[in-house]
């Protein structure tokens, strides 16, 4: 019951966070729609959600696997959208 309550709270926090889009719980990219990947939750790597690929100016992870990736992603960030690359911008990496 405690685990269920934690998951509900996690989903609510993510749903109402600025810029977060939840399209569904997943295990692999193949379970997500076009333009999304199955990324690990920022709170627990055991929970994954279908989230949009990175757009211009959005934060990214330089080692993120291309889409579709058959394994389980460890990052909470998807790769950049088609035509964009993940490059260092100041202290962060951003899609550009």
Swiss-Prot record:
Keywords: Disulfide bond, G-protein coupled receptor impairing toxin, Secreted, Signal, Toxin. Disulfide bonds join 26-38, 32-50, 37-78, 60-86, 80-95. GO terms for cellular component: extracellular region. It is found in: Secreted. The keyword Secreted applies. Belongs to the AVIT (prokineticin) family. Potent agonist for both PKR1/PROKR1 and PKR2/PROKR2, and inducer of a potent and long-lasting hyperalgesia. Also potentiates capsaicin-induced TRPV1 current, when tested on DRG neurons. At subnanomolar concentrations, this protein both induces potent chemotaxis of macrophages and stimulates LPS-induced production of the pro-inflammatory cytokines IL-1 and IL-12. In vivo, potently stimulates the contraction of the guinea-pig gastrointestinal (GI) smooth muscle (nanomolar concentration). This is Prokineticin Bm8-c.
């Amino acid at each position: 019951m405690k685990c269920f309550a934690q998951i509900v709270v996690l989903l609510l926090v993510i749903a109402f966070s600025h810029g977060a889009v939840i399209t569904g719980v997943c295990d692999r990219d193949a379970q997500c729609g076009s333009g999304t990947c199955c990324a690990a939750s920022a709170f627990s790597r055991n929970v994954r959600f279908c989230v949009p690929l990175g757009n211009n100016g959005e934060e990214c992870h330089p080692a993120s696997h291309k889409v579709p990736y058959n394994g389980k992603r460890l990052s909470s960030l998807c790769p950049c959208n088609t035509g964009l690359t993940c490059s260092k911008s100041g202290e962060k990496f951003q899609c550009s």
